[in-house]
Amino acid sequence: MRALLSAPGRRPLSPPRALIAALAVALAAPAAAVQMSDVAPMAGMSALAAAQDEAEGASPTAERAVKAAYLYKFLGYVDFPGGPLDPGAPYVVGVAGAEDVAGELARQTSGRMVNNHAVVVRRLHDGDGAAGLHLLFIGAAEGGAEAALVKAAQAAGALSVTESATGIEAGSVINFVLVDERVRFEVSLAAAERGRLKLSSRLLSVAYAVQKGGG
């Protein structure tokens, strides 16, 4: 990876550009079909986490890119309560309160597949429900609506992902945190169980923290 960031004869990339370049490599490996009993190597998530360590820190642009990349990768590491998707059906990702992440996610997933399924990004507005979603990302701008959106995602069997200090407390399955200026994520297994979601051990192995009870 370092050869990509600082190849001989090339000017070293700035941290944000270096991070985005590294993410492109991490995203190149498609996510494999996920079952809790899978033993096949699934390096995509680990590569994505390691990509940030090649950069000095996260600018707003880089932070947005990393979060979008994680959201894309999360889809391939979760068994949803409805079972495998029908052939030709897309994964649907809803985004509330984070227009910048929605735009970046749409860009990153354009033409890409997860388990042979396309990814559709849906921007949610006030009053929109979570029905039909597989993942709901709730931006920090939602504030007081966070808990209600998390509850709606749980009822719909969708993976909830937040980015606030109260995300796990509000019942979110995954919450983004900044650690030493790098985007990491924490997981609530209790919340996943309430939403009838099974998370791959590969995903859990690269989480910053895993809460096993409560939350």
What is the role of each PLM region?
Residues 2-215:
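Short hydrophobic alpha-helices and adjacent helix-cap/hinge residues
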